[in-house]
Amino acid sequence: MFDFDGLSNAFSCQTVLCVGDLMLDEFVYGEISRISPEAPAPVIAVQRSEINVGGAGNVARNIAALGARCIFVGLAGEDEAGVRLRTTLSREGLIEPLLISDPARPTTRKVRFVSDHFSTHMLRADWETPAPASGVVEQALIDAILPQLPRADIVLLSDYAKGVLTARVIRDVIDAARGLGKRVIVDPKSANFGIYSGATLLTPNRKEFADATRSRADDQASIAAAAREVMRLVDGEALLVTQSEHGMTLVPREGEVIHVPAHTVKVRDVTGAGDTVVATLAVSLAAGADWETALRTASAAAAVAVGKSGTAVVTLAELRRKILPPAFLAAEEKIAQSTDDLDQRLSAWREQGLRIGFTNGCFDILHPGHVKVLTGARAACDRLVVGLNSDASVTRLKGEGRPIQDERARAEVLAALEAVDLVVIFEEDTPMNLIERIQPNVLVKGGDYSLEQVVGQELVTARGGEVVLIDILRGFSTTSLVKRAGGRA
């Protein structure tokens, strides 16, 4: 395991200059249960829709989500989609958008119709003019980009072949960046890799690579042979071929081929996962990572991204949780910050097929009896969520003078235990609402309760879950410890 904390601490000091094709991504979700009487076409009953910044704009948002600063240069039309994108990007604190207006073209917009039940894309509608930018707009792009190069730690070109990255823009940016000693990463669209000559790193997917090199690209040997020929022609330092569930293969100009397998995860939506990969690579390399560390970081980010719906960003906290096992996480990261935070973590665990357990209590003064129950609870599941009574709740249940420790202190002590994967503070006197939200596979309590006394047992068993009672250690209780301490005061 590499020092992720050491690397990620440097992310906030980096500035990435990102240039590429900006898009508006819209996802229309609904159910499909019938065929139209007017034509042999499915009818989607729309239930909700989402609009996100897409294309190179999604790259910029992923850079910012990791805590780095992004100077973003792109094109937008003078239309409603362009206004929406400008407004959204202007609200991103770590993104400095420099958008050139092109009244002659619409803002690229993609609308995807998705079956909500099956998470299947049924249809995509595109509004775009993929022709290269006009000479006037091309010059405006170059004039916007070149003055920003001295401020950047690394340059990222995100090419979707929608008109921004013309041959001239690419050439001028790469030449100027190399003159300043700046590394350039290119996520290419053109099959003519020669137009990216001088770039530090090219990151095609397997299909793009196979088309450009006319190779099979079906094993590491064929990828390496074709990649080294490409680097000889384009004067690059390395070429990375992303291969979805087959991982990533990086071929450096000198040295051994590096292959990083993909994480085993349930794929919900691959839209924008490539954006997440190149954004993470750029930030990691700018922060001083070597090739292998940057690849492993990007692979983990991709695993988080494909577990989300739509065009998604991956935050630094999410990436940290993916890379580091729960036992290595700092205590504060094992405390749910909101219901959304709780829901996201539960969703990620369920998508991995993990068995979720739940127990609860006040845990005012942690003692061996608590530890025995928590350890037993963790043994009965893959991830243990501990519901913790808030200060107000403890006072109502235990009386004045309690709790001895406030809820934050109690949560941090619990979170420091290896047996505990997540702590959730709740305000009610019982955890019934929390259990209903979590829907655990396993509900655990100490053996001083009978099955009928366990709050939420009906909910859990009705959904096919189980209730586990752990034998307690006699002679340990917080109340008795408080009394003994008071007697000695």
Swiss-Prot record:
Region Ribokinase, residue ranges: 1-330
Active-site annotation: D275
Record-annotated disulphide pairs: none
Keyword Translocase among record annotations: no
Reaction equations catalysed: D-glycero-beta-D-manno-heptose 7-phosphate + ATP = D-glycero-beta-D-manno-heptose 1,7-bisphosphate + ADP + H(+); D-glycero-beta-D-manno-heptose 1-phosphate + ATP + H(+) = ADP-D-glycero-beta-D-manno-heptose + diphosphate
Molecular functions per Gene Ontology: ATP binding; heptose 7-phosphate kinase activity; heptose-1-phosphate adenylyltransferase activity; phosphotransferase activity, alcohol group as acceptor
Assembly behavior: Homodimer.
Protein name: Bifunctional protein HldE
